[in-house]
Amino acid sequence: MLTIDLGSLSYAEAEAVQTARLGEVSTGGEDTLYLVEHPPVITLGRNGGIENLHAGRGFLAERGIELAQSSRGGNITCHFPGQLVAYPVFRIERRPGGLRSFFHDLEEVVLRTLHTFGLEASRHEGRPGVWIDNRKICSIGVAVRRWTTYHGLALNVGRDLSLFNLITLCGLPDAEATSLHRELDDDSVTMQEVKDVLTRQFLAIFTHPAVAAGEAAL
């Protein structure tokens, strides 16, 4: 598995990077994990979500917030500096369990990452992503083309979650956003530390599929 840190990159540019790599991975290239932070952007998934946006295009444009249609699954969400986004461009044709197992394993990567930092999170049946009670700390939305995944997960790290005030998170009125720093009440964990742990968990889960789900590999 290759891991490439894209630094800060616009949503459209990151999607172009993924789709270019997808063609290579789907024909035998090595699975590739991209890590990135995006400038402020609100994205709409294949399930729509414009009805859950509470600001007009003019309001967003004045504040430098992009609005983008995405090919990923799911509803509305947002990305911003201080949120770690991971895009696994992985071939899943021969992976046991197919896309359902892949999605479960993405959640497992995040659960183990948070556990490393002392946070116990969980899955919620029927509500994709990773949660701490009713607070969503990580959104997940993927797309598949030619048996190869793209898009992925967005883990909130920093305290500033103000962009979420402009949307109904994932179309769920009772859900609220949270982050690693908020839950720890401690801002000392760096983005690089989170990247390092998340990458290790991707390696543990996706290159060692025999490891039982839920068994910490810390």
Curated annotation (Swiss-Prot):
Its EC number is 2.3.1.181. It holds the Pfam family LplA-B_cat. One of its GO terms (biological process) is protein modification process. Coiled coil: none annotated. It catalyses: octanoyl-[ACP] + L-lysyl-[protein] = N(6)-octanoyl-L-lysyl-[protein] + holo-[ACP] + H(+). Pathway: Protein modification; protein lipoylation via endogenous pathway; protein N(6)-(lipoyl)lysine from octanoyl-[acyl-carrier-protein]: step 1/2. CDD domains: LipB. Its main location: cytoplasm. The keyword Heme does not apply. GO terms for cellular component: cytoplasm. It is found in: Cytoplasm. PANTHER family: LIPOYLTRANSFERASE 2, MITOCHONDRIAL-RELATED (PTHR10993:SF7), OCTANOYLTRANSFERASE (PTHR10993). Belongs to the LipB family. Catalyzes the transfer of endogenously produced octanoic acid from octanoyl-acyl-carrier-protein onto the lipoyl domains of lipoate-dependent enzymes. Lipoyl-ACP can also act as a substrate although octanoyl-ACP is likely to be the physiological substrate. HAMAP family: LipB. This is Octanoyltransferase.
